[in-house]
């Protein structure tokens, strides 16, 4: 039996989300259909609002609804340290930890030649430009996931930064190989930041 077209379209839309297969998408579609109309309207407005109002900070690449994100525009942050993360959700994880008060740079991905993702596809060039324009930065912390792609990206960035004589460090043990930063608890992240090592 085929679903009516509007439901089929909704199932297809949900299946575009990462990790959502046909069964989950179908369940979500029927749940959405049973929601009060106001909740559905609020949900759709939230989707449109996030697409219209959220953009990348021109300095660090974090997501923001302002011209420049709150972290970059905060003069009380440590201007001598930049932590490089893969995604905004990783930045949020470190902010929730509350132990790091420096700046960030969000790559929005990692190098993955198999997937056709090279240096031009992620936010590396702007990091190098940022470092060239800012003499205050003394350390760059590469806080990337411990995956082959994360490791190769860290090494690539490290080689680009070395000539600038800026200290480049990597998060310490505490994050197991293959683990994602967003799922690590605050104690693990704190130990990783405190025990970072030079590259």
Curated annotation (Swiss-Prot):
SUPFAM superfamilies: Recombination protein RecR. Keywords: DNA damage, DNA recombination, DNA repair, Metal-binding, Zinc, Zinc-finger. The keyword Metal-binding applies. The keyword Zinc applies. InterPro entries: DNA_Rcmb_RecR (IPR000093), Rcmb_RecR (IPR023627), Rcmb_RecR_Znf (IPR015967), TOPRIM_dom (IPR006171), TOPRIM_RecR (IPR034137). Belongs to the RecR family. This is Recombination protein RecR. It comes from Lactobacillus helveticus (strain DPC 4571).
């Amino acid at each position: 039996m085929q679903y009516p077209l509007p439901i089929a379209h909704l199932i297809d839309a949900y299946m575009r989300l990462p990790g959502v297969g046909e069964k989950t998408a179908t369940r979500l579609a029927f749940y959405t259909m049973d929601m009060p109309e106001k909740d559905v309207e609020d949900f759709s407005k939230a989707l449109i609002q996030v697409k219209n109002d959220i953009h990348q900070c021109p300095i660090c690449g974090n997501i923001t609804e302002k011209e420049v994100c709150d972290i970059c525009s905060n003069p009380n942050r440590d201007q001598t340290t930049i932590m490089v993360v893969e995604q905004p959700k990783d930045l949020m994880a470190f902010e929730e930890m509350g132990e790091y008060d420096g700046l960030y740079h969000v790559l929005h991905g990692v190098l993955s030649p198999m997937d056709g993702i090279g240096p031009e596809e992620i936010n590396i060039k702007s990091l190098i430009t940022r470092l060239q324009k800012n003499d205050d930065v003394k350390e760059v912390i590469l806080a990337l996931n411990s995956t082959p792609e994360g490791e190769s990206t860290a090494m690539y960035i490290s080689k680009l930064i070395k000539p600038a004589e800026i200290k480049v460090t990597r998060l310490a043990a505490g994050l197991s190989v293959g683990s994602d930063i967003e799922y690590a608890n605050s104690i693990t992240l704190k130990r990783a930041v405190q025990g970072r090592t030079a590259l």
